[in-house]
Structure formats: C-alpha cells, structure tokens
A protein has these predicted regions:
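Acidic, Gly/Pro-rich loop/turn segments at junctions of secondary structure
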Residues: 1-89
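Hydrophobic residues within well-ordered alpha-helices
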Residues: 2, 52, 98-102, 117
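Paired acidic/hydrophobic, glycine-rich loop segments that form the ligand-binding mouth/hinge
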Residues: 8-12, 104-108, 124
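Alpha-helical segments flanking ligand/cofactor-binding loops in enzyme cores
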Residues: 24, 50, 96-97, 151
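A conserved hydrophobic position in a structured secondary element of the catalytic/binding core
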Residues: 34-35, 90, 108, 157
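Short, hydrophobic alpha-helical packing/hinge segments within bilobed ligand-binding/sensory domains
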Residues: 92-96, 113
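C-terminal effector-binding regulatory domain of bacterial HTH transcription factors
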Residues: 110-119, 123, 129-168
C-alpha cells in the first residue's frame, strides 16, 4: 500500500486507492477510446459499446481495475463491456504504440493520446460515451502535509497543469 512506502510525492492517474494518504487533484483527465484509421478501415468503426466485443481491444493491466472490462456511460446509462484482444500490457506507452500500428482499440488517458488525435494518427471512437475518470492527483503521506517542499512542489504541479493542455 502507498501508506507503507517511503516517498514524498506520487503522481497518480485515477482515484487514490488509500485513505491514509493526502490526495490533491491537480488536473482533470479523461480516458478516450481510440484506434488508427487503418484499423477502423479494416474492421469498421464501433457505433455502440456492445460493438467492442467484436473488435481487437488492447488491454492494459492497471492497479485494481477490472481487466478486460470497459465501463462506458452515455447519459444515465452505464454499460460494462467485456473486451478481448490478442495484446495486453501493463505499459500504457506500449499500448498506444500498438494502437498507432493498427493492432486495435485502446482506452487511454487524453494526456497520452491528444497529440495523435490532433495529427490524425489516432481517431476517437464512441466519443459520445464517457469512460471512468482518470484525473491526475498528487499523493503524499499525511506526515508530509506540513512540509514546505511538498506543498511547493504540489502547488507547482497544479499551476503547470492549469496552464497546459493534453498533449502539450
């Protein structure tokens, strides 16, 4: 658990897992579903979440997230879709590279894929559906909450993220 580790500040995407640490949200962040245009030309573009079951989805094992299940929300309706594919990793950069190479659809943080979406190397799919948030948090042990160096660093991060946009 984070609370047992010796660290000053940890950066985390998504909800903090441990109530024994201080978590400050430093930036909003969405997860997006995207694929290379070549993949979508070959396999078609999913129109509904259930269509994902017939696609190659690139799996990313992260923390306690349910592996192989993607949660998508439109309005008040949330669907949990069991996805599958030949490729999975615990490294988000590798997963994005596989998507860029046309191997399937990936769910990844907007900060990781924004430049590829802008350039057209990736295309967002099911854009009308929301995925679970992956807001960016600075996490630090309670014993550091009064440390000036920790406060200064976390304030710096929050200011930096506030003046940046995903992919820049």
């Amino acid at each position: 658990p984070l609370a047992a580790d010796a660290f000053d500040v940890c950066i985390r995407f998504g909800e903090p897992p441990d109530a024994r640490v201080i978590a400050r949200r430093i930036a909003p962040n969405r997860r997006l579903l995207c694929a290379a245009p070549a993949y979508l030309e070959r396999r078609g573009t999913p129109k509904l979440p259930s269509d994902l079951a017939r696609h190659d989805c690139i799996g990313i094992r992260q923390g306690d997230d349910a592996y192989g299940q993607w949660r998508l929300t439109a309005g008040r309706k949330t669907e949990v879709v069991k996805v599958r594919g030949a490729l999975s990793t615990n490294d988000g950069e590798i997963a994005v590279n596989w998507a860029l190479d046309g191997h399937g659809i990936v769910m990844r943080a907007e900060w990781d894929v924004a430049r590829y979406l802008r350039s057209g190397r990736l295309v967002q799919v099911l854009a009308d559906h929301q995925t679970p948030p992956a807001d960016i948090y600075a996490i630090y042990p309670q014993r550091h909450q009064t440390a000036a160096r920790v406060r200064a660093f976390v304030d710096f991060l929050a200011e930096r993220f506030a003046t940046s946009s995903p992919g820049h």
